[in-house]
Swiss-Prot record:
NAD(+) binds at residues 12-23. GO terms for cellular component: cytosol. It comes from Pyricularia oryzae (strain 70-15 / ATCC MYA-4617 / FGSC 8958) (Rice blast fungus). This is Mannitol-1-phosphate 5-dehydrogenase. It comes from the Eukaryota. Belongs to the mannitol dehydrogenase family. It catalyses: D-mannitol 1-phosphate + NAD(+) = beta-D-fructose 6-phosphate + NADH + H(+).
């Protein structure tokens, strides 16, 4: 770790120099006094960051726009300069990432090597995955352990502490001419599990809310923000709406979103003991946020990666399966899932093309098992089979 005038200079290595990395995570790290070292695989992004001494984070909301200037960063291409990156990880205070849940396994080997090189004199690095997925840091930790000898796994906690997090901030597609600048909503939530740091102080990072039990925050966020956002996008896409804002101006779509959030709110309040009035206030806030006209959030961007969003622990099937087991209403979630199944062959979205292929080549039962991860013994299974069959039938009718 670098020293300045005898004083320790805090350093964070962040994997993924995309919009969330630059606009959300790095912004808070910068504001907390960290030097940020971005690790990315794109030459163009790394070169731009290294050639430009600052970029802007532009927060937009009903009350106006605020700009923040980010400085004190560097970028390393993790594909071509691994040795350099290893040294940075070995001396970092914090290692974060926003690469997408499916990419965690690819960044794990270099993080494993870097952590293994850490001096015993240093405090353990705080490793926090900032992904839209439950238990993403746990997933990353398991991948890291796969690349370490058994003896080094045993004492890994002396070199790193792994904390799950829940992040919440809407970052729309950016103007192609915006360069490194990032436009996003003013609202944010970054909740991190305090318990892995039991005998150490948590890292000092502005914007983080440290908690002892993360699950209620993760599920409330995933099953309200992500469920609501995706429901609006998929219904909007199927009705030829351009943005989520446009979709929510349609009363029928707005009603579908509210119904879906009524389904999930029933689960959230019962499961986590959250006050129903508090949850309703949260829902109202979310409806305002996803309907922010200043974000220009395209339905294709919000709907992208339908295979992941239709999976077992995700925003539709996850809560719907739990509600179905309890005999509770999950009809609006099923309607949203149907719209997601119809999100096929969308330009610049590989998963939507893969979804179309899976739907065309498999039985409804196979699709429900493969895509949704449901077992025939689960109460939701026959309902999803019926929906998949209907979507497949409609596709066949369209081709005749």
């Amino acid at each position: 770790m670098s020293q300045t005038n005898g004083t320790h200079t805090k350093k964070a290595v962040h994997f993924g120099a995309g919009n969330i990395g630059r606009g959300f995570v790095a912004c808070f790290l910068h504001n907390s006094g960290y030097e940020v070292v971005f690790a990315d695989v794109t030459d163009r992004t790394c070169d731009a960051l290294n050639n430009q001494t600052s970029y802007k984070v532009i927060e937009v909301g009903a009350e106006g726009t605020e700009e923040k200037t980010i400085t004190n960063y560097r970028a390393i291409n993790s594909k071509t300069k691994e040795d350099e990156l290893l040294q940075e990880i070995a001396t970092a205070d914090v290692v974060t990432c926003s690469v997408g849940p499916n990419i965690l396994k690819f960044i794990a080997p270099v993080i494993a090597k870097g952590l293994d090189m850490r001096s015993e004199e240093l405090k353990p690095a705080a490793v926090i995955a900032c992904e839209n997925a439950i238990g993403a840091t746990d997933t990353l930790a398991e991948h890291i352990k796969e690349h370490l000898p058994a003896t080094r796994v045993e004492d890994l906690s002396t070199r790193a502490r792994f904390a799950n997090s829940a992040i919440d901030r809407i970052v729309p597609a950016q103007d192609p001419n915006s360069g490194l600048d990032v436009k996003l909503e003013k609202f944010y939530e970054w909740v991190v599990d305090r318990t892995p740091f039991a005998d150490h102080e948590v890292p000092s990072i502005e914007g983080i809310h440290w908690v002892d039990n993360l699950e209620p925050y993760i599920e409330r966020k995933l099953y309200t923000v992500n469920t609501g956002h995706a429901t609006a996008a998929y219904h909007g896409y199927n009705r030829q709406k351009r943005t989520v804002y446009d979709a929510l101006q349609d009363r029928e779509i707005q009603s579908e979103v509210r119904r879906a959030l009524e389904n999930t709110s029933k689960l959230i309040t019962a499961k986590h003991g959250i006050n129903p009035e508090e949850q309703q206030a949260y829902v109202r806030k979310i409806m305002t946020r996803i309907g922010n006209p200043h974000l220009e959030d395209a339905v294709e961007r919000v709907g992208r990666a339908p295979l992941r969003k239709l999976s077992r622990k995700e925003r539709f099937v996850g809560p719907a399966a739990e509600l179905a087991e309890k005999g509770e209403d999950c009809s609006a979630l099923l309607d949203a899932a149907e719209m997601a199944l119809r999100f096929q062959n969308v330009e610049e979205d590989a998963e939507s093309k893969e979804l179309a292929k899976i739907m065309a080549e498999n039985s409804a039962e196979q699709v429900v098992s493969q895509v949704c991860g449901l077992q025939p013994s689960e109460k939701l299974y026959p309902k999803m089979v019926e929906i998949v069959h209907r979507v497949q039938q409609d596709s066949m009718d369209d081709t005749e």
